[in-house]
Regions:
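Bacterial N-terminal signal peptides that target proteins for export
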Residues: 1-10
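N-terminal signal peptide c-region/cleavage motif recognized by signal peptidases
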Residues: 15-17
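Surface-exposed cap/linker segments adjacent to membranes
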Residues: 19-32
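Short, surface-exposed loop/turn motifs at beta-strand boundaries within globular domains
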Residues: 27, 38-40
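Short secondary-structure junctions
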Residues: 31-36, 299-301
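Concave beta-strand-loop units of leucine-rich repeat
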Residues: 40-217, 222-262, 266-283, 294-309
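Short, surface-exposed alpha-helical segments at coil->helix boundaries
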Residues: 285-288
Length: 309
């Protein structure tokens, strides 16, 4: 005989769920946004750039259908992240420049097996978070640029056989990283670009030419469609090696001091190239015109003012 659940208990359960979903007036008060599905369940919360507190994240952890959470440019701490540990249904987490987050807080997501997209760019995470990410084998997009990760920590990413997008920044281009890159053959988007030399009060310095080992490693990623190498030492020789990437449609080379008209000549051989950013490089209007003639329909962003051709 099946046990009978009192009607009052059922009503209480539904009421508690309703309260969890509806008691989010503070999100609007902070200037955030909420998205619901057809049944009224909260499936996405955007708190980008708000003054959300750690304790307020407890309300979000109680949302059973929450899939997307944007906490970018907030001041939440590791304590707030740990409050989110029960939110295992989250598929997309954006912590872009949530600058107080470290590996300790990121331990909250180690059991989030549904997570597909993770952005921790500009946080204080290091190799511990890479190890956690490596255990989330369903990840499709990962941004760890401008963090404290090291070259050796990237080994943890090898199990990510579904990874399509990776951003790590140019500062981690060591030998170990190159070996890891060669194994990430599912990548369609790769960002190895560095920051603008003047960003964060830094003075402009010259960038050494990129060793041939770097483009050689990248050239093995045959599924790439977007490649970003901004403010790196890539030049004509490296672009010649990369011309074997016949699916790349978008190439970002802004601020690359070794990119000149000779480099543009090499790009004429790129079979699928549709968009090119060569702002703040040494290309000339004549070189740009020649590439446009060779690659009909290509969109080129050039010059210090970002002129579109």
């Amino acid at each position: 005989m099946r046990p009978v659940v009192p009607r009052g208990v059922i009503l209480l359960l539904f009421a508690s769920l309703a309260v969890a979903s509806s008691n989010l007036d503070w999100v609007d008060g902070l200037g955030g946004k909420i998205e619901r599905d057809a049944a009224g369940n909260v499936i996405a919360v955007n708190l980008r750039g708000t003054w959300v507190s750690d304790s307020e994240l407890l309300d979000l952890a109680r949302l059973p259908k929450l899939e997307r959470l944007d906490l970018s440019h907030t001041r939440i701490t590791d304590e707030g992240m740990l409050y989110l540990k029960p939110a295992t249904g989250i598929r997309e987490l954006n912590l872009y420049y949530a600058e107080q987050i470290t590996d300790q807080g990121m331990s909250a997501i180690k059991d989030w097996k549904n997570l597909k997209r993770l952005n921790v760019r500009g946080t204080r995470i290091s190799d511990g978070t890479l190890a956690i990410a490596g255990g989330l084998t369903g990840l499709e997009s990962l941004d760890v640029a401008y963090t404290e990760i090291t070259d050796s920590g990237l080994d943890a990413l090898v199990p990510l056989t579904h990874l399509k997008e990776l951003s790590i920044g140019r500062s981690k281009l060591g030998g170990n990283e190159l070996e890891v890159l060669r194994l990430l053959t599912t990548l369609e988007y790769l960002d190895l670009g560095g920051p603008h030399p003047g960003a964060g009060g830094k003075t402009e310095t010259s960038v050494s030419p990129l060793p041939a080992s770097v483009p050689c490693a990248i050239s093995e990623l045959k599924e790439l469609r977007v490649l970003k190498l901004a403010y790196s030492g890539i030049g004509a020789d490296g672009l010649r090696i990369l011309s074997s990437l016949d699916k790349v449609e978008k190439l970002a080379l802004e601020g690359c001091s070794h990119v000149n008209d000779q480099a543009l000549t090499e790009l004429a051989q790129w079979k699928s190239l549709k968009f090119l950013d060569v702002q703040e490089t040494k290309v000339t209007p004549q070189g740009v015109a020649a590439l446009e003639k060779a690659r009909l329909g290509i969109v080129i962003l050039s010059g210090d003012a970002g002129v579109v051709h």
